[in-house]
Design a protein with these regions (language model features):
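Membrane-interface segments at loop-to-transmembrane junctions
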Residues: 150-151, 187-200, 270-278, 283, ...
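Short cytosolic juxtamembrane segments of multi-pass membrane proteins
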Residues: 2-6, 181-195, 571-572, 665-677
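Hydrophobic alpha-helical transmembrane segments of multi-pass inner-membrane transport and secretion
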Residues: 20-47, 56-92, 113-126, 206, ...
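Basic-flanked hydrophobic alpha-helices used for secretion and membrane insertion
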Residues: 315-329, 334-556
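N-terminal Sec/SRP start-transfer signal
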Residues: 1-33, 197-202, 211, 247-295, ...
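Short helix-loop junctions at transmembrane helix boundaries
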Residues: 41-55, 124-156, 213-230, 605-673
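Hydrophobic alpha-helical segments
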Residues: 111-258
Length: 677
């Protein structure tokens, strides 16, 4: 009987005795299990699936499960490596006292069983309890009505159990392999084996500088949102490589320069810090770089998702200035007058009235912008090149209807607003010459043109022409000039946009749309602010929830890496600080040295992460334009969200610094002996 209970009793005793390491390890396991279950629960929740615009949200949650699963694997293995490093001396002592490798392996299996079961049970319990709260929070963000009731996802429990059972078995297998490879003497001496002084790897440092600069240049030279979307992944990879190389090679070079400065180095608070970090910088560098990358991921994820969600209302107002928006393609069969008549008849049948009507005709077509800034019209040339610009034309009458500052143009004159390359004051458009009488400060369209964010044009030129005749003349000429050889692609598009407000219930608006749609003979687009609002909040609310969720996971990883690294460093430094105190270093000097080291280890990754965020600011702003249809507020609004996220993260970071410095000091400090003995 005693033989049966020996290993369980010893396993529990070991965990309790090493609670300083196993408690954070268990909390990590419980937190990741709970977070994975919550996302799995949301991915399969029937209540959420019953809402028509929730499909994308559940896809996001499913993708979040994958991210949490991958990150949990990395985090659990990372924390386990620190725990096992601290236990190597203990396991070696067991071997010296007579326990064979198979006995120690059995002990590790029992410990893994207890830890795994405890983590799964507590994690699932926490996940089940919090899942309803998370669902209510998600519904609040999505502007869905919150429903009462409680449910448990059997699929979520099964997925979580399978994933983390496999993960804990892999961790156990890794520990057993390490045990069988090591010799008892090596385990006993592992904690006292020092690191060789690393050499400065100039090639690695050069690679770091080159990749980091390349990533920053790439992030700050892109012009269009689609270009930012294409290059974002490559820029991230370059910055990650550069960060690891700079921390690994650059930190060693800096420490050696500090050591060469005799005035700085030979001070008690600097001597112990610099010498200790220099000999263990290979491990420190990777840890610092990991903290930096995780902090950057957290800051970018939270700031962008907060910006997207808080900018929904502004996006709706700028993209849809009226409640209902129709844009109809015009041709011989469908004129603007026909479109207006059709819409007004449909409105009359509803018993409501159209209010705040806004309408205009617009012509858009692609052109090739030459080096001399001439606009060339050639359909075949446009199809064979990627260097294409686009032109959007409206009339002076339409422009003056919805702008407070009217303009007056003569024949051959235009008002112009360009994004990208500017046009000359006198420019050629096909066989016509135009003079720019006035340069506008913003697009002449009455609402934000979201389409321009989805194009890869090198430039966009908005022109205001004197009258309808000029616009129609341009349309006829451009249509003829842009005809392709196969004549299958319509490049010039003449559209009529009719926007209005109508005070009607959602059901009436849907009926209105269904009755009106078949009456148009050409291509058209329809937008209703109420319906679009539901879709916006469903998408951006899901983004925000997942962003905050992953931000919490990244924060957990950051704090744990910092904690375990600093605790491990504290135990490694304990003997050295004990010797320094015995030869005369005061407790105050020990505290100053600890403060100096913790400051370096903590705030270097934070400062570097902030630099990374602002280095990527231009690219992220361009990416946001793909989703946040409000050009006037994108940059300033994202800056506000970024600064707010930075401030909040810095406060949490400072609290972690205080707690870690206090724990580190308790480990390395040696209490003075009582003089009475």
């Amino acid at each position: 009987m005693r033989k049966i209970t020996f290993y369980p009793h010893l396993a529990v005793t070991n965990v309790l005795r090493n609670n300083q390491f196993y408690l954070p390890y268990l909390l990590t396991n419980i937190a990741t299990v709970a977070m994975f279950y919550i996302l799995a629960y949301l991915s399969f929740d029937d209540t959420l699936a019953s809402f028509p615009s929730a499909n994308n949200v559940q896809v996001m949650m499913a993708l979040g499960c994958i991210v949490v699963g991958i990150f949990s694997t990395i985090l659990v293995f990372y924390t386990n490596s620190f725990v096992m490093k601290r236990r190597q001396h203990e396991l070696g002592l067991y071997s010296i006292l007579g326990m064979e490798t198979r006995h120690i392996a059995r002990l590790l299996r029992v410990e893994a069983l207890f830890l795994g079961l405890f983590s799964l049970v507590c994690g699932l319990a926490a996940g089940i309890i919090l899942s309803k709260l998370m669902l209510m929070l998600l519904f609040k963000l999505l502007h869905f009505p919150v429903s009462l009731g409680f449910s448990i996802s059997i699929v979520g429990i099964a997925m979580t159990t399978v994933l983390f059972t496999v993960l804990f078995l892999l961790v156990l297998l890794h520990n057993l392999i390490q045990l069988h490879r090591a010799k008892p003497v090596e385990l006993l001496r592992s904690s006292s084996v020092g690191e060789r002084e690393p050499k400065v790897k100039w090639l690695l440092a050069l690679v770091g500088v080159v990749t980091l600069v390349a990533g920053y240049v790439m992030a700050n030279t892109i012009q269009s949102p689609l270009q930012a979307l294409t290059l974002f992944f490559f820029a991230v990879i370059l910055v990650i490589i550069g960060t690891y190389c700079i921390f690994t090679a650059g930190s060693i070079a800096v420490l050696k320069l500090l050591r060469a400065n005799k005035h700085y180095y030979y001070k008690p608070q600097h001597f112990t810090t610099v010498s200790g970090l220099l000999y263990r910088m290979k491990q420190n560098a990777v840890g610092l770089a990991s903290i930096c990358i995780l902090s950057t991921m957290l800051l970018v994820t939270v700031s962008t998702t907060v910006c997207l969600y808080l900018g929904v209302e502004t996006s709706l107002k700028e993209s849809f200035p009226r409640n209902i928006n129709y844009t109809i393609s015009l041709d011989e069969e469908q004129t603007a007058e026909d479109a207006v008549k059709t819409i007004e008849q449909a409105i009359k049948q509803t018993g409501h009235q159209a209010e705040n009507v806004l309408s205009y005709t617009a012509l858009s077509f692609p052109v090739v912008l030459s080096s001399s800034h001439e606009l060339t019209l050639d359909g075949n040339a446009i199809r064979s090149t990627s260097i294409v610009s686009t032109v959007c034309v409206i009339t002076q009458e339409d422009y003056n209807c919805y702008n407070t500052t009217p303009i007056t143009l003569s024949k051959g004159q235009v008002a112009c607003y360009s994004e990208g390359a500017e046009l000359e004051n006198n420019f050629q458009l096909g066989d016509q010459t135009f003079t720019i009488a006035q340069r506008l400060t913003d697009t002449p369209l009455p609402f934000y043109d979201a389409f321009r964010n989805l194009t890869n044009y090198v430039s966009i030129h908005y022109l205001v022409v004197p009258d309808e005749a000029t616009l129609q003349e341009l349309y006829q000429k451009e249509t003829k000039a842009l005809d392709t050889e196969d004549n299958t692609t319509r490049m010039a598009d003449l559209t009529y946009t009719y926007c209005f407000d109508m005070d009607a219930a959602d059901e009436e608006l849907e009926t209105f749309y269904n009755q009106l749609s078949p009456k148009f003979h050409t291509t058209y687009s329809y937008g209703c602010r109420q319906f679009i609002s539901q879709e916006f909040y469903a998408i951006y609310g899901g983004f925000l929830f997942l962003g905050l969720f992953l931000g919490l996971l990244f924060l957990l990883g950051t704090v744990l890496i910092i904690y375990f690294k600093q605790i491990s460093e504290g135990y490694d430094d304990q003997k050295r600080y004990e010797i320094m105190q015995k030869v005369g270093l005061s407790e105050r000097e020990v505290r100053r040295s600890v403060h100096s080291q913790i400051l370096l280890v903590f705030f270097l990754p934070l400062v570097t992460a902030m630099i990374h965020v602002f280095g990527a600011f231009h690219m992220i702003t361009k990416l946001l334009q793909l989703f946040l249809y409000a050009k006037t507020m994108t940059t300033s609004f994202f800056l506000t969200c970024t600064l707010g996220t930075l401030a909040g993260f810095a406060v949490i970071y400072a609290l972690v610094y205080w707690a870690t410095a206090h724990t580190y000091y308790k480990i390395v400090r040696v209490k003075q002996a009582d003089p009475r003995f």
